[in-house]
């Protein structure tokens, strides 16, 4: 954790979830409440097909709803795409950009991630910008070089602590059950903090840096207690309300 930074626990449902899954979001909305919700933010990013209904379920809850991606353009002949304005029109508050699965499956590079981040900001959304190294890059000792490049090229100059969140996701840890050591996570997050402060000054010191990569109830408290880890971006464990809320409630002791 970073003193004076409000943590964010975010769930990315990826290509999972139909209307039958809305009961999980309802349970999450009911579980995110009380004193903890005044200290820790919670967010779920379901498929775009569920955005509007999900936000309606959270009308009386602090649980926020966001999108998993957006197009870099406001509108136009881009079949199958969803713009940041459309996300905002569904009352979404955040959008994930640059997730490793987008970078790998769709060949999205840093320049495109930067354009999507700018589009999110233009729609008054908070951009969750994902960065992280592959297994090959890690074995070659290039983790910090990759993070430096991705932060430099994916973040626009107008990024602030209010409109931008960083998510560190070691690609080799996503969906594999593998997790970096606490010291590895601490080193990566400390490095990113220094890079953000170097570029953005005091504003960079206030930006939230989430950890993502096989986060689950059993390791959440340990990971989220690491210096400069300001929350989590959760994959599979966010599909079930019990698991998501267990991770969220790990902050009961951490923020007490």
From Swiss-Prot:
Catalytic activity of the protein: D-glyceraldehyde 3-phosphate = dihydroxyacetone phosphate
Gene3D superfamilies assigned to the protein according to its UniProt record, in alphabetical order: Aldolase class I
Entry's Gene Ontology BP terms: gluconeogenesis; glyceraldehyde-3-phosphate biosynthetic process; glycerol catabolic process; glycolytic process
A GO MF term: triose-phosphate isomerase activity
Presence of keyword Nucleus: no
Isomerase is among the record's keywords: yes
One Pfam family linked to the record: TIM
Subcellular location: Cytoplasm
First-listed, main subcellular location of the protein, grouped into a coarse class: cytoplasm
EC number(s) from the headed UniProt entry: 5.3.1.1
Domain of life: Bacteria
Active site positions, chain numbering: 99 (electrophile), 169 (proton acceptor)
Binding site for substrate: 12-14, 175, 214, 235-236
Key words of the record: Cytoplasm, Gluconeogenesis, Glycolysis, Isomerase
InterPro entries linked to this entry: Aldolase_TIM, TIM_sf, TrioseP_Isoase_bac/euk, Triosephosphate_isomerase, Triosephosphate_isomerase_AS
Record's subunit section: Homodimer.
Family from the record: Belongs to the triosephosphate isomerase family.
Protein name: Triosephosphate isomerase
Upper lineage: Bacteria, Pseudomonadati, Pseudomonadota, Alphaproteobacteria, Hyphomicrobiales
Gene (UniProt): tpiA
């Amino acid at each position: 954790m970073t003193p004076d930074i409000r943590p964010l626990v975010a769930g990315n449902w990826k290509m999972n979830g139909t209307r039958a899954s809305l009961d999980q979001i309802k349970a999450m909305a009911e579980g995110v409440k009380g004193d903890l919700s005044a200290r820790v933010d919670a967010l779920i990013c379901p498929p775009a097909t569920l955005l509007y209904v999900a936000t309606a379920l959270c009308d009386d809850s602090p649980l926020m709803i966001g999108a998993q991606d957006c197009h870099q353009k406001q509108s136009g002949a881009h079949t199958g795409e969803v713009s940041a304005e459309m996300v905002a029109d569904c009352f979404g508050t955040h959008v994930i950009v640059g997730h490793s699965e987008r970078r790998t499956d769709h060949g999205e590079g840093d320049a495109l991630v930067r354009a999507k981040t700018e589009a999110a900001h233009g729609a008054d959304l908070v951009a969750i910008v994902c960065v992280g190294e592959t297994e090959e890059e890690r074995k070659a000792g290039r983790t910090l070089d990759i993070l430096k490049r991705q932060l430099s090229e994916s973040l626009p100059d107008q990024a602030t602590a209010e409109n931008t969140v960083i998510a560190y996701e070691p690609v080799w840890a996503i969906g594999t059950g593998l997790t970096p050591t606490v010291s590895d996570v601490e080193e990566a997050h400390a490095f990113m903090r220094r890079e953000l402060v170097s570029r953005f000054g005091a504003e960079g010191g206030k930006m939230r840096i989430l950890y993502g990569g096989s986060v689950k109830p059993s390791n959440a408290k340990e990971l989220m207690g690491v210096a400069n880890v300001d929350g989590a971006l959760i994959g599979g464990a966010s599909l079930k309300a019990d698991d998501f809320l267990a991770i969220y409630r790990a902050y009961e002791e951490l923020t007490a």
